[in-house]
Every structure is written in structure tokens, then in C-alpha cells.
Amino acid sequence: MAQTQADTAARKPVGQSVSATRRVSRLRRHARLRKRIAGTQQRPRLVVHRSARHIHVQLVNDANGTTVAAASSIETDVRGLDGDKKARSVRVGQLIAERAKAAGIDTVVFDRGGYTYGGRIAALADAARENGLKF
């Protein structure tokens, strides 16, 4: 039986850093989440990745493994925004909703990536919902 990254990461050595422990826990949560959800062509998966500085989001069709649309806080129109990271997350949520509409998608499956639903993740999700995505 092949071991996944989450399985091997679950066996943490004594004295592991707090950030490493949090990363391992997030990977385990994401692995559990991914067992239950998958994106299709009509209803792709809205995948969120959050770093300390940026947030990235993709619409993924898991049936053929393609990315339908993507948005990120690294893009020039988002980088120029005044405000905090949450304001940038709201703008990224608006962008992904616009790009999903342009691709003919109105319903998605939300994959929070193992992150807790709050702060920047919730702000992105709420902005995407307000701009027409259903999930």
C-alpha cells in the first residue's frame, strides 16, 4: 500500500517545530477533505491555497485534471490594492467569480485546502458567493 504525504507526515519526530506541526495537521485535514469531494466539468472544485503573504484560488476539473480558471493576490491589479490581506482575498474572490462566469460555470465545490473556515478563507468564499458563484 502506497503511503501518502499526509500518512508519512503524521509520524512527527519529538521536538518538531510548531509551524511544522501545523503544516502536518493541515495536510491531514486536507487529505480527509479530498476523500469526500471532487470536481466535475459542470461543477469544478474551487481550491484555495493560503500562504503567509498571498492567497491563490483555482477552479479544477478533477475528471480530466485541468484548471478551468485561476486567480491570485500576486496579480498586478490585486497587488496594487490598499488594505490588508483580507481585502486582497475579497478581490481574489471577485476575480475568480468573474472568470468562472466567463467560463460558463455557476456552481462549484469549495475545497478550503485544510484551512479553517475563517479570516481570509471566509472572506474569499463570501466574495465569490456575492459575485454569483453557488456553493
Curated annotation (Swiss-Prot):
Q: Which GO terms describe its cellular component?
A: cytosolic large ribosomal subunit
Q: Where is this region: Disordered?
A: 1-23
Keyword Ribonucleoprotein appears in the UniProt entry: yes
One biological process term from GO is: translation
Q: Which CDD domains match?
A: Ribosomal_L18_L5e
| One Gene Ontology molecular-function label | 5S rRNA binding
Q: Which UniProt keywords apply?
A: Ribonucleoprotein, Ribosomal protein, RNA-binding, rRNA-binding
Query: Entry's InterPro entries?
Result: Ribosomal_uL18_bac-type (IPR004389), Ribosomal_uL18_bac/euk (IPR005484)
Show the coiled coil region(s): none
Ribosomal protein: is it a keyword of this entry? yes
> Briefly, what is this protein's role?
This is one of the proteins that bind and probably mediate the attachment of the 5S RNA into the large ribosomal subunit, where it forms part of the central protuberance.
Question: What family does the entry list?
Answer: Belongs to the universal ribosomal protein uL18 family.
Protein name, entry field: Large ribosomal subunit protein uL18
Q: Which organism is it from?
A: Mycobacterium marinum (strain ATCC BAA-535 / M)
